[in-house]
């Protein structure tokens, strides 16, 4: 609401999955994934056709939509697929108007195909970069997250000490 967004879309891919996983617990494998979040906080997970069952098993978000825009880069035809649309997703999270403001976080992880799909679905929408929202959200850490980070660094330090002991000219 502070950014005057009707929807925030956070996208991820196999190599950089953290943002979609942050909200959903799901991370894509060879496809892309996105989370659409309304200003009221209602959310939906968007995945490609190959991720339907994995997403249903892993996601903490119950609303899961299969969009062709999130398919793998090999661009399979999927003749049997009746895909969901961005309009379906937005309607499910309570965004029904057409003239809206859409923030896209993980902008660099948003493929041209995904962006074209958003623009085609909402030609009157204002689409803005919203990476700063994800950066701000992920910079706040809980006590458990801090403990996990400390443990990760402790393990990495032990591994480095072992490597240094093993190195020979």
Predicted regions and their residues:
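A composition/biophysics-driven feature that prefers long, compositionally simple stretches
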Residues: 1-159
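C-terminal helix-coil-helix/basic helical segment that borders enzyme active sites and/or dimer interfaces
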Residues: 161-169
């Amino acid at each position: 609401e502070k950014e005057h967004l009707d929807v925030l879309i956070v996208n991820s891919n196999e190599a950089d999955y953290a943002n979609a996983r942050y909200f959903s617990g799901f991370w894509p494998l060879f496809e892309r994934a996105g989370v659409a979040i309304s200003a009221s906080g209602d959310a939906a997970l968007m995945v490609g056709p190959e991720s339907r069952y994995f997403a249903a098993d892993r996601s903490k978000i119950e609303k899961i939509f299969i969009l062709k825009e999130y398919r793998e880069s090999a661009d399979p035809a999927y003749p049997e697929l009746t895909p969901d649309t961005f309009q379906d997703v937005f309607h499910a999270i309570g965004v029904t108007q057409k003239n809206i403001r859409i923030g896209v976080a993980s902008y660099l992880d948003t493929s041209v195909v995904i962006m074209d799909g958003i623009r085609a679905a909402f030609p009157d929408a204002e689409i803005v970069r919203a990476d700063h929202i994800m950066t701000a959200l992920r910079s706040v850490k809980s006590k458990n997250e801090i403990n996990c980070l400390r443990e990760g660094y402790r393990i990495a330090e032990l591994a480095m000490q072992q490597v240094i002991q093993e190195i020979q000219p």
